[in-house]
């Protein structure tokens, strides 16, 4: 029969229908032996573990944890402990995570004993040994300045189905390690105790990250080894992962600023040495006798100017104050640009006498040629309200000439009046010869109209076809009209 290494009361957190609650159990830890594997068993009460864990009472469902499947054992802090003064710790396996709690001394003892049996070859000791072994002269110690001060933490997660996860072939449970400069996804090996790195995401290539009560998610950039996309992990430690990532990014920013400050100090010291002349100048390259100096044999700032006839500047002294040299005579009294003006004038005269050459096609760059004058009909204007203008010139007040004497604009000229119609022709007059054949009256002149009066009949309401009313004939006698 197997002997228990440790046993005692433990609180086990369970979740049903979205509600978390603590359940008090009796836990028994068995080591690895020829009769069985190392395991942790849970019972309802203390009496159930008698007889090597084969009690008659009912055992809790699926509450046997094999330590070979254990990934990590670490103390954690919870918001609502099962009782005051209780300390919690998490036991992660390849399938799920278990949250356990006990009083503070018992919780530390459980963590230490579980680490001893689950990781026999690992560094599970929480406290330093009482008698540390003496180091020999040949052994080497790690440099604390070189090794990172923050090792990071590991979390057991389950990959959710996303486009990026399917592209990378991720499914199932993995271990997500939060390191100093990146996130690393570890896959348990064949022995379930060795974690193999599968993917990693540097913090500088993460676009965004966030957490929820039951998951942790981040969006990777296109330069990540996994490619762009969103990765979602189901875990109850989403808040812990988020805080660990945030702390790592903050540490990386501080280290980056410190590195930039050291670079600035180095650059300043280098410039100071150059300014003080402490840097030794490089010796000039040796030249073979008789060989001409190459064009690029020396740097630009160290090229030597060949000695000229005179080192004086052209405008170092005024023209009048330049002393005349012997043998030059009175030729130096000419103006400075005298020869230049004559040379230009001769060129202009020759250009006028010779035939002008045809201008090249690409005389001026595009966009710099002078704009051509627009013609009269280049900008036509569409006439509007032509029916209103009626082909008359539109004259407005501000377009008329201004008269300064009257402080007003000139009045437009009057328009031509409407032409009067021609006078109607007069009635036909009888000639004197016709008058003789008449009634024989000579009293009236021939200017009398033939129809002098036309009266409207009131009784019948119609016009007479002849003379209705009294008609005066040529003799001067009035007669009644007859129809």
Curated annotation (Swiss-Prot):
Compartments, record wording: Cytoplasm; Nucleus
Matching InterPro entries: Docking_Protein_DOK, Dok1/2/3_PTB, IRS_PTB, PH-like_dom_sf, PH_domain
Gene3D superfamilies, A to Z: Pleckstrin-homology domain (PH domain)/Phosphotyrosine-binding domain (PTB)
Domain named IRS-type PTB: residues: 151-259
Regions of compositional bias (Pro residues) in chain numbering: 411-424
Feature: compositional bias, Polar residues: 434-460
Region (Disordered): 293-326, 409-483
GO BP terms, alphabetized: cell surface receptor protein tyrosine kinase signaling pathway; Ras protein signal transduction
Residue numbers carrying Phosphoserine: 48, 269, 291, 416, 462
Post-translational modification remark: Constitutively tyrosine-phosphorylated. Phosphorylated by TEC. Phosphorylated by LYN. Phosphorylated on tyrosine residues by the insulin receptor kinase. Results in the negative regulation of the insulin signaling pathway. Phosphorylated on tyrosine residues by SRMS.
Modified residues (Phosphotyrosine): 296, 337, 362, 377, 398, 409, 451
PH domain boundaries: 4-119
Database matches in SMART domains: IRS, PH, PTBI
One GO cellular component term: nucleus
Residues found modified as N-acetylmethionine: 1
Keywords annotated in UniProt: Acetylation, Cytoplasm, Nucleus, Phosphoprotein
Subunit record text: Interacts with RasGAP, INPP5D/SHIP1 and ABL1. Interacts directly with phosphorylated ITGB3. Interacts with SRMS (via the SH2 and SH3 domains).
The protein's role, per its UniProt record: DOK proteins are enzymatically inert adaptor or scaffolding proteins. They provide a docking platform for the assembly of multimolecular signaling complexes. DOK1 appears to be a negative regulator of the insulin signaling pathway. Modulates integrin activation by competing with talin for the same binding site on ITGB3.
Family the UniProt entry places it in: Belongs to the DOK family. Type A subfamily.
Name of the protein in question: Docking protein 1
Gene: DOK1
């Amino acid at each position: 029969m197997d002997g228990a290494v440790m046993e005692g009361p433990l609180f086990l957190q369970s979740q049903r229908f979205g509600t978390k609650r603590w359940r008090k159990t009796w836990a028994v830890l068995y080591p690895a032996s020829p009769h069985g594997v190392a395991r942790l068993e849970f019972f309802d009460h203390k009496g159930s573990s008698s007889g090597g864990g084969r009690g008659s009472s009912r055992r809790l469902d699926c509450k046997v944890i094999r330590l070979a499947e254990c990934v990590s054992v670490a103390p954690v802090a919870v918001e609502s402990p099962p009782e005051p003064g209780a300390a919690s710790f998490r036991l992660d396996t390849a399938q799920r995570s278990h949250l356990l709690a006990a009083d503070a001394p018992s919780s530390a003892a459980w963590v230490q004993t579980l680490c001893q049996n689950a990781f026999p070859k690992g560094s599970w000791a929480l406290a330093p040994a009482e008698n540390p072994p003496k180091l020999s002269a040949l052994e080497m110690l790690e440099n604390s300045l070189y090794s990172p001060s923050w090792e990071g933490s590991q979390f057991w997660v389950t990959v959710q189905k996303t486009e990026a996860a399917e592209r990378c072939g991720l499914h199932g449970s993995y271990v997500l390690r939060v390191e100093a400069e990146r996130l690393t996804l570890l896959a348990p090996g064949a022995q379930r105790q060795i974690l193999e790195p599968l993917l990693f995401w540097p913090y500088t290539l993460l676009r965004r990250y966030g957490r929820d009560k039951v998951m942790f998610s981040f969006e990777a950039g296109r330069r990540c080894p996994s490619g762009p996309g969103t990765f979602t992990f189901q875990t109850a430690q989403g808040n812990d992962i988020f805080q660990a990532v945030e702390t790592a990014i903050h540490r990386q920013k501080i280290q980056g600023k410190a590195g930039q400050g050291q670079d600035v100090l180095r650059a300043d010291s280098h410039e100071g040495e150059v300014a003080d002349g402490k840097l030794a100048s490089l010796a000039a390259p040796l030249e073979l006798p008789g060989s001409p100096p190459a064009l690029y044999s020396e740097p630009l700032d160290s090229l030597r100017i060949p000695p000229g006839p005179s080192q004086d500047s052209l405008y170092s002294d005024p023209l009048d104050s330049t002393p005349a040299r012997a043998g030059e005579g009175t030729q130096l009294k000419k103006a400075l640009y005298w020869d230049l003006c004559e040379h230009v004038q001769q060129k202009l005269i020759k250009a006028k006498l010779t035939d002008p050459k045809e201008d090249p096609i690409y005389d001026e760059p595009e966009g710099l040629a002078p704009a051509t004058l627009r013609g009269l009909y280049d900008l036509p204007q569409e006439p509007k309200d032509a029916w209103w203008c009626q082909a008359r010139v539109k004259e407005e007040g501000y377009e008329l000439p201004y008269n300064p004497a009257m402080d007003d604009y000139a009045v437009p000229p009057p328009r031509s009046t409407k032409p009067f119609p021609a006078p109607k022709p007069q009635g036909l007059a009888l000639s004197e010869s016709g008058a003789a054949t008449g009634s024989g009256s000579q009293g009236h002149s021939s200017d009398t109209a033939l129809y002098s009066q036309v009266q409207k009949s009131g009784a019948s309401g119609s016009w007479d076809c002849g003379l209705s009313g009294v008609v005066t004939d040529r003799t001067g006698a009035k007669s009644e009209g007859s129809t």
